[in-house]
């Protein structure tokens, strides 16, 4: 079933990373005020397109993003989407979501379960942004560690600054 599920590249995007955003971003220090700035900075410092995905996201940090938000149903109407360096693709259906994951260079999330496991199933580079105290539990579900990396958003209950998290992401992306 999965063998025929994900190989279409219906979007025709090339050389991109996917960052999936959900409620697990909410506990990152200064995310409501600073996330937009660091996403735009990252897009300038790497040689890849950034496609941000989210589904029905009503969180304040997400509402505060000024990055272009394109609903999946409208992406074909948005002719300049291929030229955008960073954009948000909202409410992507499951099949197309798998397609985005499969054709990416790197997938990043705060352990969005399905997203992480599909990325690892495809043996793709994956960054999981976790609280250090969650890592042991999460690792019970991670079998393919060859392409799996963790970046902490907190250690010993001390939140890590968003700037430090994005510096680590930038380093990993540029080392691909």
What is each of the regions a protein language model found here?
Residues 1, 92-97, 154-162:
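A short acidic, often aromatic-flanked loop/helix-cap motif at beta-alpha or helix-coil junctions
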Residues 1-16, 27:
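A nucleotide-sugar donor-handling region in carbohydrate enzymes
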Residues 9, 46, 79, 173-176:
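Short, flexible helical or helix-coil boundary motifs
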Residues 18-23, 54-55:
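Short loop/turn segments at strand-loop or loop-helix junctions that form parts
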Residues 24-33:
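A short, glycine/small-residue-rich beta-strand->loop->alpha-helix junction that serves as a flexible
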Residues 34-136:
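Donor-binding and catalytic core of enzymes assembling or modifying cell-surface/extracellular glycoconjugates
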Residues 116-176:
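Nucleotide-sugar donor-binding patch of glycosyltransferase catalytic domains
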């Amino acid at each position: 079933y999965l063998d025929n599920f994900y190989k279409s590249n219906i979007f025709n995007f090339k050389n991109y990373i996917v960052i999936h955003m959900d409620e697990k971003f909410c506990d990152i220090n200064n995310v409501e005020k600073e996330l937009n700035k660091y996403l735009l900075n990252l897009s300038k410092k790497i040689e890849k397109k950034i496609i941000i995905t989210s589904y029905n996201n009503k969180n304040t940090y997400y509402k505060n993003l000024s990055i272009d938000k394109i609903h999946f149903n409208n992406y074909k109407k948005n002719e300049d989407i291929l030229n955008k360096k960073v954009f948000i693709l909202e409410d992507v259906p499951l099949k197309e979501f798998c397609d985005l994951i499969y054709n990416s260079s790197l997938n990043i999330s705060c352990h969005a379960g399905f997203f992480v496991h599909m990325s690892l199933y495809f043996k793709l580079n994956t960054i999981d942004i976790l609280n250090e105290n969650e890592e042991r539990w999460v690792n019970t579900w991670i079998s393919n560690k060859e392409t799996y990396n963790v970046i902490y958003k907190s250690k010993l209950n001390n939140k890590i600054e968003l700037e430090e998290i994005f510096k680590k992401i930038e380093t990993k992306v540029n080392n691909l």
